[in-house]
């Protein structure tokens, strides 16, 4: 009887511990949760390669503790659809697929629930690109203009309750970069959510090549796909600002968490 009484007291004493643990759970990975692929080109413009090399290191640092596997490639010709589909997301830093085979594999990957995080030049397309699917995928049409040289810019959050922007300030300064403007209006499209834009307070924007106005989204998602495009990615300063880096991590986590097979972070 005394032993039963002692066990009851012990059990009751543990209740607050278990309650606290449930209120503040921690989910430690017992194995890598998923695989991600980083793609960039060493043959791109020098400033884009600078960004890409830093980008590779940025995402590699996120693997510390083996939370996920990260593969890096400079050739998508080695990744047909059957291989691409092994990855929860593909991160393109300064280039996009080339040629019919690479493009077809990427289209199939995205149409079947693949994840894509694209930076700056990875989304560049003009009338010579001749890839209508990619233009629709991005939602912005073809290239219109850009500022030059790379400059810092004030950015405004458009959607403050989105997972990518919910912990960002309403406005913040982006590190120096070149930013693209596009031909088509993203805001009139039901399938596009604009998350971040350059503030009109930046105008006139540029020293050599000057942009005088216009709506300028720089981060958005196409709701028909598991994707996000981030317009920044020129030079070696893009990872120098904590708020922007936080947004990059948010974007990565959001894309990964929406894997059709289930949220890897819940494993």
Task: Please identify what each model-predicted range represents.
Residues 23-34, 58-61, 201-218, 222-267:
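Extracellular ligand-binding/catalytic regions of CAZymes and related secreted enzymes
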Residues 148-224:
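Catalytic beta-strand/loop cores that center a nucleophilic Ser/Cys/Thr
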Residues 27, 35-126:
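Helical hinge/lid and interdomain linker segments adjacent to catalytic or ligand-binding clefts
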Residues 54, 58, 86, 101, ...:
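Extracytoplasmic/secreted proteins, especially bacterial periplasmic and envelope-associated proteins
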Residues 1-4:
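Positively charged n-region of N-terminal signal peptides that target proteins for export
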Residues 96-169:
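A glycine-rich, often tryptophan-bearing local segment used as a flexible ligand/cofactor-contacting loop or short
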Residues 7-17:
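Bacterial N-terminal signal peptides
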Residues 115-117, 193, 226:
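Proline-centered loop/turn at the N-terminus of a beta-strand
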